[in-house]
Protein backbone atom coordinates (compact mmCIF):
# COMPACT_ATOMS: atom_id res chain seq x y z
CA UNK A 1 0.00 0.00 0.00
CA UNK A 2 1.23 3.51 -0.77
CA UNK A 3 2.58 5.43 2.18
CA UNK A 4 -0.08 8.11 2.19
CA UNK A 5 -3.12 6.13 1.11
CA UNK A 6 -6.09 5.12 3.20
CA UNK A 7 -7.32 1.55 3.31
CA UNK A 8 -11.10 1.04 3.64
CA UNK A 9 -12.61 -2.45 3.78
CA UNK A 10 -16.30 -3.05 3.09
CA UNK A 11 -18.22 -5.86 4.74
CA UNK A 12 -18.84 -8.99 2.60
CA UNK A 13 -22.45 -8.88 3.80
CA UNK A 14 -23.07 -5.98 1.42
CA UNK A 15 -21.91 -7.82 -1.70
CA UNK A 16 -25.43 -8.70 -2.87
CA UNK A 17 -26.41 -5.04 -2.62
CA UNK A 18 -23.46 -3.75 -4.64
CA UNK A 19 -22.66 -3.66 -8.32
CA UNK A 20 -19.21 -5.24 -8.32
CA UNK A 21 -16.60 -6.47 -10.76
CA UNK A 22 -13.96 -9.08 -10.15
CA UNK A 23 -10.47 -7.80 -9.64
CA UNK A 24 -8.51 -7.98 -12.94
CA UNK A 25 -5.74 -9.84 -11.13
CA UNK A 26 -8.17 -12.55 -10.09
CA UNK A 27 -7.63 -12.06 -6.35
CA UNK A 28 -10.22 -13.96 -4.38
CA UNK A 29 -12.52 -11.71 -2.40
CA UNK A 30 -11.20 -8.48 -3.96
CA UNK A 31 -13.73 -6.32 -5.79
CA UNK A 32 -14.13 -2.88 -7.27
CA UNK A 33 -17.30 -1.26 -5.98
CA UNK A 34 -19.06 1.10 -8.33
CA UNK A 35 -21.26 2.97 -5.89
CA UNK A 36 -20.55 5.25 -2.99
CA UNK A 37 -20.73 3.99 0.54
CA UNK A 38 -22.50 7.25 1.47
CA UNK A 39 -25.88 5.64 0.73
CA UNK A 40 -25.38 3.18 3.60
CA UNK A 41 -24.66 5.89 6.17
CA UNK A 42 -27.84 7.23 7.79
CA UNK A 43 -28.28 10.96 7.40
CA UNK A 44 -29.05 11.15 11.11
CA UNK A 45 -25.58 9.75 11.90
CA UNK A 46 -23.83 12.45 9.88
CA UNK A 47 -26.01 15.10 11.49
CA UNK A 48 -25.08 13.84 14.95
CA UNK A 49 -21.38 14.00 14.08
CA UNK A 50 -21.66 17.57 12.84
CA UNK A 51 -23.83 18.60 15.80
CA UNK A 52 -21.27 17.15 18.21
CA UNK A 53 -18.47 19.15 16.59
CA UNK A 54 -20.51 22.37 16.74
CA UNK A 55 -21.34 21.73 20.40
CA UNK A 56 -17.66 21.17 21.20
CA UNK A 57 -16.80 24.43 19.46
CA UNK A 58 -19.33 26.36 21.54
CA UNK A 59 -18.10 24.86 24.81
CA UNK A 60 -14.44 25.43 24.00
CA UNK A 61 -14.96 29.03 22.91
CA UNK A 62 -16.76 29.69 26.18
CA UNK A 63 -14.20 28.14 28.50
CA UNK A 64 -10.94 28.06 26.56
CA UNK A 65 -9.60 31.58 27.20
CA UNK A 66 -7.08 30.62 29.87
CA UNK A 67 -6.81 26.96 28.99
CA UNK A 68 -3.11 27.08 28.09
CA UNK A 69 -1.79 27.74 31.59
CA UNK A 70 -1.20 24.10 32.60
CA UNK A 71 -0.49 20.71 31.01
CA UNK A 72 1.29 22.36 28.08
CA UNK A 73 3.17 19.08 27.49
CA UNK A 74 -0.01 17.82 25.79
CA UNK A 75 0.84 20.09 22.86
CA UNK A 76 4.22 18.40 22.25
CA UNK A 77 3.94 15.74 19.57
CA UNK A 78 5.54 12.31 19.84
CA UNK A 79 5.95 12.04 16.05
CA UNK A 80 9.33 13.02 14.63
CA UNK A 81 7.75 13.69 11.24
CA UNK A 82 5.18 16.10 12.66
CA UNK A 83 7.80 17.71 14.89
CA UNK A 84 9.83 18.40 11.75
CA UNK A 85 6.75 19.84 10.01
CA UNK A 86 6.37 22.59 12.60
CA UNK A 87 5.24 20.59 15.63
CA UNK A 88 1.52 20.60 14.85
CA UNK A 89 -0.30 18.77 12.02
CA UNK A 90 -3.74 17.14 12.28
CA UNK A 91 -4.29 16.30 8.59
CA UNK A 92 -1.21 14.24 7.68
CA UNK A 93 -2.54 10.95 6.24
CA UNK A 94 0.40 8.54 6.49
CA UNK A 95 1.07 4.92 7.32
CA UNK A 96 2.66 6.03 10.61
CA UNK A 97 1.09 5.23 13.98
CA UNK A 98 2.92 8.11 15.70
CA UNK A 99 1.01 10.76 13.74
CA UNK A 100 -2.24 9.72 15.45
CA UNK A 101 -1.34 11.56 18.66
CA UNK A 102 -2.37 14.75 16.82
CA UNK A 103 -5.74 13.47 15.61
CA UNK A 104 -7.38 10.13 16.54
CA UNK A 105 -9.18 10.16 13.17
CA UNK A 106 -5.81 9.57 11.47
CA UNK A 107 -5.70 6.10 13.05
CA UNK A 108 -6.68 3.50 10.45
CA UNK A 109 -6.61 -0.19 9.61
CA UNK A 110 -3.52 0.34 7.47
CA UNK A 111 -1.66 0.86 10.79
CA UNK A 112 -2.72 -2.47 12.28
CA UNK A 113 0.21 -4.23 13.91
CA UNK A 114 2.42 -1.15 14.05
CA UNK A 115 4.58 -0.69 17.16
CA UNK A 116 6.55 2.55 17.52
CA UNK A 117 8.95 4.10 20.03
CA UNK A 118 9.84 7.76 20.42
CA UNK A 119 12.61 9.61 22.24
CA UNK A 120 13.27 13.32 22.47
CA UNK A 121 16.01 15.41 24.03
CA UNK A 122 14.16 18.60 24.90
CA UNK A 123 14.92 22.03 26.34
CA UNK A 124 16.64 22.31 29.73
CA UNK A 125 17.89 18.74 29.91
CA UNK A 126 14.40 17.25 29.63
CA UNK A 127 13.95 13.76 28.23
CA UNK A 128 10.72 12.46 26.69
CA UNK A 129 9.99 8.86 25.65
CA UNK A 130 6.96 6.82 24.68
CA UNK A 131 5.43 3.74 23.06
CA UNK A 132 2.42 3.43 20.72
CA UNK A 133 0.58 0.46 19.13
CA UNK A 134 -2.44 0.01 16.84
CA UNK A 135 -4.71 -2.92 15.90
CA UNK A 136 -7.72 -3.18 13.58
CA UNK A 137 -11.15 -4.20 14.88
CA UNK A 138 -13.68 -5.66 12.45
CA UNK A 139 -14.03 -4.18 8.97
CA UNK A 140 -14.10 -0.48 9.86
CA UNK A 141 -12.63 0.08 13.31
CA UNK A 142 -9.14 0.45 14.75
CA UNK A 143 -7.95 0.83 18.32
CA UNK A 144 -4.66 2.14 19.63
CA UNK A 145 -2.84 2.45 22.94
CA UNK A 146 0.08 4.59 24.06
CA UNK A 147 2.17 5.64 27.03
CA UNK A 148 4.25 8.81 27.09
CA UNK A 149 6.77 9.86 29.77
CA UNK A 150 8.03 13.44 30.03
CA UNK A 151 10.87 13.93 32.52
CA UNK A 152 12.15 17.43 33.24
CA UNK A 153 15.33 16.50 35.06
CA UNK A 154 16.58 17.61 38.46
CA UNK A 155 15.96 21.16 39.69
CA UNK A 156 17.16 23.15 42.68
CA UNK A 157 14.82 23.58 45.62
CA UNK A 158 15.04 26.91 47.46
CA UNK A 159 13.38 28.54 50.45
CA UNK A 160 11.64 31.94 50.51
CA UNK A 161 15.00 33.71 50.83
CA UNK A 162 16.46 31.93 47.81
CA UNK A 163 18.72 29.62 49.78
CA UNK A 164 19.21 26.22 48.16
CA UNK A 165 17.78 23.47 50.36
CA UNK A 166 18.07 20.53 47.97
CA UNK A 167 16.88 19.26 44.62
CA UNK A 168 13.67 17.82 43.25
CA UNK A 169 12.45 16.19 40.06
CA UNK A 170 9.32 16.67 37.95
CA UNK A 171 7.59 14.43 35.45
CA UNK A 172 4.34 13.96 33.55
CA UNK A 173 3.01 10.60 32.37
CA UNK A 174 0.18 10.05 29.89
CA UNK A 175 -1.71 6.78 29.32
CA UNK A 176 -4.03 6.88 26.32
CA UNK A 177 -6.49 4.70 24.44
CA UNK A 178 -7.78 5.47 20.94
CA UNK A 179 -10.57 4.28 18.70
CA UNK A 180 -11.37 5.28 15.12
CA UNK A 181 -14.12 4.27 12.72
CA UNK A 182 -14.48 4.63 8.94
CA UNK A 183 -17.84 6.37 8.61
CA UNK A 184 -17.55 6.35 4.80
CA UNK A 185 -14.79 5.61 2.31
CA UNK A 186 -13.59 9.21 2.73
CA UNK A 187 -14.72 10.20 6.22
CA UNK A 188 -13.27 8.86 9.46
CA UNK A 189 -13.94 9.81 13.07
CA UNK A 190 -11.88 9.08 16.16
CA UNK A 191 -11.64 9.54 19.91
CA UNK A 192 -8.62 9.55 22.20
CA UNK A 193 -8.95 9.28 26.00
CA UNK A 194 -5.91 10.17 28.11
CA UNK A 195 -5.20 9.61 31.80
CA UNK A 196 -2.60 12.12 33.01
CA UNK A 197 -0.38 11.74 36.06
CA UNK A 198 1.95 14.50 37.23
CA UNK A 199 4.50 14.48 40.06
CA UNK A 200 6.37 17.66 40.99
CA UNK A 201 8.58 17.76 44.10
CA UNK A 202 6.40 15.40 46.12
CA UNK A 203 3.10 16.86 44.91
CA UNK A 204 0.91 14.81 42.59
CA UNK A 205 -2.08 15.50 40.36
CA UNK A 206 -4.27 13.46 38.01
CA UNK A 207 -6.48 14.46 35.10
CA UNK A 208 -8.59 13.03 32.29
CA UNK A 209 -8.49 14.47 28.77
CA UNK A 210 -10.33 13.58 25.58
CA UNK A 211 -9.59 14.39 21.94
CA UNK A 212 -12.34 14.21 19.32
CA UNK A 213 -11.30 14.23 15.67
CA UNK A 214 -12.69 13.87 12.19
CA UNK A 215 -10.81 13.55 8.89
CA UNK A 216 -11.93 13.79 5.27
CA UNK A 217 -9.55 12.25 2.74
CA UNK A 218 -10.01 12.35 -1.04
CA UNK A 219 -7.60 9.83 -2.54
CA UNK A 220 -8.10 11.08 -6.10
CA UNK A 221 -6.97 14.61 -5.22
CA UNK A 222 -4.72 13.56 -2.33
CA UNK A 223 -6.63 16.09 -0.24
CA UNK A 224 -6.94 15.79 3.54
CA UNK A 225 -9.09 18.03 5.78
CA UNK A 226 -9.34 17.61 9.54
CA UNK A 227 -11.01 19.05 12.61
CA UNK A 228 -9.99 18.29 16.21
CA UNK A 229 -11.38 19.29 19.57
CA UNK A 230 -8.37 18.66 21.80
CA UNK A 231 -7.88 18.13 25.53
CA UNK A 232 -11.49 18.21 26.70
CA UNK A 233 -11.66 17.32 30.38
CA UNK A 234 -10.20 18.38 33.70
CA UNK A 235 -8.34 17.43 36.84
CA UNK A 236 -9.61 14.66 39.09
CA UNK A 237 -6.89 15.25 41.71
CA UNK A 238 -5.33 18.68 42.16
CA UNK A 239 -1.84 19.69 43.29
CA UNK A 240 -3.06 22.03 46.03
CA UNK A 241 -6.18 24.08 46.73
CA UNK A 242 -6.91 25.11 43.15
CA UNK A 243 -7.66 23.23 39.96
CA UNK A 244 -5.55 23.67 36.84
CA UNK A 245 -7.20 23.84 33.44
CA UNK A 246 -6.26 21.67 30.51
CA UNK A 247 -5.13 23.39 27.28
CA UNK A 248 -8.45 22.79 25.52
CA UNK A 249 -8.33 23.80 21.89
CA UNK A 250 -10.00 23.76 18.49
CA UNK A 251 -7.86 22.90 15.46
CA UNK A 252 -8.30 22.81 11.69
CA UNK A 253 -5.93 21.19 9.21
CA UNK A 254 -5.34 20.98 5.46
CA UNK A 255 -2.83 18.81 3.54
CA UNK A 256 -2.61 18.29 -0.21
CA UNK A 257 -0.35 17.54 -3.16
CA UNK A 258 -0.83 19.21 -6.54
CA UNK A 259 -0.62 17.32 -9.82
CA UNK A 260 2.60 15.42 -10.36
CA UNK A 261 4.57 17.58 -7.91
CA UNK A 262 5.83 15.14 -5.23
CA UNK A 263 5.48 17.66 -2.41
CA UNK A 264 2.65 17.71 0.12
CA UNK A 265 1.79 21.06 1.64
CA UNK A 266 0.14 21.42 5.05
CA UNK A 267 -1.37 24.25 7.05
CA UNK A 268 -2.66 23.74 10.59
CA UNK A 269 -4.66 26.32 12.52
CA UNK A 270 -4.66 25.95 16.30
CA UNK A 271 -5.37 27.97 19.46
CA UNK A 272 -8.70 28.79 17.81
CA UNK A 273 -10.46 29.29 21.14
CA UNK A 274 -8.90 32.76 21.37
CA UNK A 275 -7.80 35.34 18.83
CA UNK A 276 -5.47 37.72 20.66
CA UNK A 277 -2.06 36.16 21.34
CA UNK A 278 0.28 39.17 21.74
CA UNK A 279 3.99 38.85 22.32
CA UNK A 280 6.85 41.17 23.28
CA UNK A 281 9.76 41.70 20.94
CA UNK A 282 13.19 43.09 21.69
CA UNK A 283 14.22 45.66 19.11
CA UNK A 284 17.71 44.22 18.60
CA UNK A 285 16.69 40.56 18.90
CA UNK A 286 18.36 40.06 22.31
CA UNK A 287 17.05 40.00 25.86
CA UNK A 288 18.60 43.40 26.71
CA UNK A 289 16.78 45.68 24.26
CA UNK A 290 13.57 47.70 24.58
CA UNK A 291 10.53 45.46 24.50
CA UNK A 292 7.59 46.26 22.22
CA UNK A 293 4.15 44.67 22.42
CA UNK A 294 3.07 43.05 19.15
CA UNK A 295 -0.68 42.58 18.73
CA UNK A 296 -1.46 43.37 15.09
CA UNK A 297 -3.96 41.46 12.94
CA UNK A 298 -1.18 39.84 10.90
CA UNK A 299 0.77 38.84 13.99
CA UNK A 300 -2.25 37.22 15.63
CA UNK A 301 -3.19 35.44 12.40
CA UNK A 302 0.20 33.85 11.83
CA UNK A 303 0.63 32.88 15.49
CA UNK A 304 -2.36 30.59 14.92
CA UNK A 305 -0.84 28.89 11.87
CA UNK A 306 1.79 26.17 11.39
CA UNK A 307 3.19 25.50 7.90
CA UNK A 308 4.79 22.31 6.62
CA UNK A 309 5.93 20.64 3.40
CA UNK A 310 7.20 17.10 2.89
CA UNK A 311 8.57 15.18 -0.07
CA UNK A 312 6.38 12.15 -0.87
CA UNK A 313 8.08 10.79 -3.99
CA UNK A 314 8.78 7.41 -2.36
CA UNK A 315 7.10 5.27 0.33
CA UNK A 316 10.55 4.24 1.58
CA UNK A 317 11.90 7.65 2.63
CA UNK A 318 10.81 11.23 3.27
CA UNK A 319 12.13 14.72 3.94
CA UNK A 320 10.15 17.52 5.53
CA UNK A 321 10.45 21.12 6.68
CA UNK A 322 8.18 23.21 8.88
CA UNK A 323 7.74 26.75 10.13
CA UNK A 324 6.00 27.75 13.36
CA UNK A 325 5.66 31.53 13.66
CA UNK A 326 4.48 31.28 17.27
CA UNK A 327 7.61 29.38 18.30
CA UNK A 328 9.78 32.04 16.66
CA UNK A 329 7.97 34.99 18.21
CA UNK A 330 7.81 33.34 21.64
CA UNK A 331 11.61 33.53 21.59
CA UNK A 332 11.57 37.25 20.75
CA UNK A 333 12.27 38.20 24.36
CA UNK A 334 15.19 35.76 24.51
CA UNK A 335 18.25 35.01 22.42
CA UNK A 336 16.57 33.42 19.43
CA UNK A 337 18.64 32.15 16.53
CA UNK A 338 18.18 32.64 12.80
CA UNK A 339 16.52 29.23 12.49
CA UNK A 340 14.12 29.72 15.42
CA UNK A 341 10.67 28.56 14.36
CA UNK A 342 12.03 26.31 11.61
CA UNK A 343 12.31 22.52 11.90
CA UNK A 344 13.35 19.66 9.63
CA UNK A 345 12.63 15.93 9.53
CA UNK A 346 13.72 12.88 7.60
CA UNK A 347 13.13 9.16 7.67
CA UNK A 348 13.63 5.84 5.91
CA UNK A 349 11.76 2.56 5.81
CA UNK A 350 13.33 -0.84 5.10
CA UNK A 351 10.81 -3.69 4.89
CA UNK A 352 9.06 -3.84 8.29
CA UNK A 353 11.27 -1.26 10.02
CA UNK A 354 11.28 2.52 9.98
CA UNK A 355 13.47 5.27 11.44
CA UNK A 356 12.57 8.96 11.68
CA UNK A 357 14.50 11.92 13.05
CA UNK A 358 13.67 15.61 13.52
CA UNK A 359 15.68 18.66 14.55
CA UNK A 360 14.76 22.15 15.76
CA UNK A 361 16.51 25.02 17.53
CA UNK A 362 13.99 27.38 19.19
CA UNK A 363 16.82 29.67 20.37
CA UNK A 364 20.61 29.63 20.61
CA UNK A 365 20.69 27.73 23.90
CA UNK A 366 18.13 25.05 23.06
CA UNK A 367 18.71 22.39 20.44
CA UNK A 368 16.02 19.71 20.33
CA UNK A 369 16.25 16.30 18.69
CA UNK A 370 13.51 13.68 18.28
CA UNK A 371 13.91 10.05 17.20
CA UNK A 372 11.21 7.55 16.15
CA UNK A 373 11.68 3.80 15.66
CA UNK A 374 8.83 1.73 14.22
CA UNK A 375 8.13 -1.88 13.35
CA UNK A 376 5.16 -3.60 11.70
CA UNK A 377 4.60 -6.83 13.59
CA UNK A 378 2.37 -8.22 10.84
CA UNK A 379 5.29 -8.17 8.42
CA UNK A 380 7.50 -10.00 10.92
CA UNK A 381 5.12 -12.74 12.02
Per-segment meaning from a language model:
Residues 12-13, 54-55, 88:
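Enrichment for repetitive, rod-forming helical segments
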Residues 6, 20-50:
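Bacterial N-terminal signal peptides that target proteins for export
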Residues 2-9:
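Extreme N-terminal basic, low-complexity initiation segments
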Amino acid sequence: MALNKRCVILSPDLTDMLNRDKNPNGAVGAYTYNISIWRFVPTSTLRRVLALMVLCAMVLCAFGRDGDQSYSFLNITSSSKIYGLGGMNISLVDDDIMTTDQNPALLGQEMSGQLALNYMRYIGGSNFAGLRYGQKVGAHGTWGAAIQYNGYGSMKETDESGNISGTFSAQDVSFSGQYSYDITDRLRGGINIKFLYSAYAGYTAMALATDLGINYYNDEKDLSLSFVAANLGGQIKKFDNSYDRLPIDLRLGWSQTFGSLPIRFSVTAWNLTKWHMPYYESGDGTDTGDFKRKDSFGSNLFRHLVFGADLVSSPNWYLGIGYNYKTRTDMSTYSRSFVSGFSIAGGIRVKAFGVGIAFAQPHTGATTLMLNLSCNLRDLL
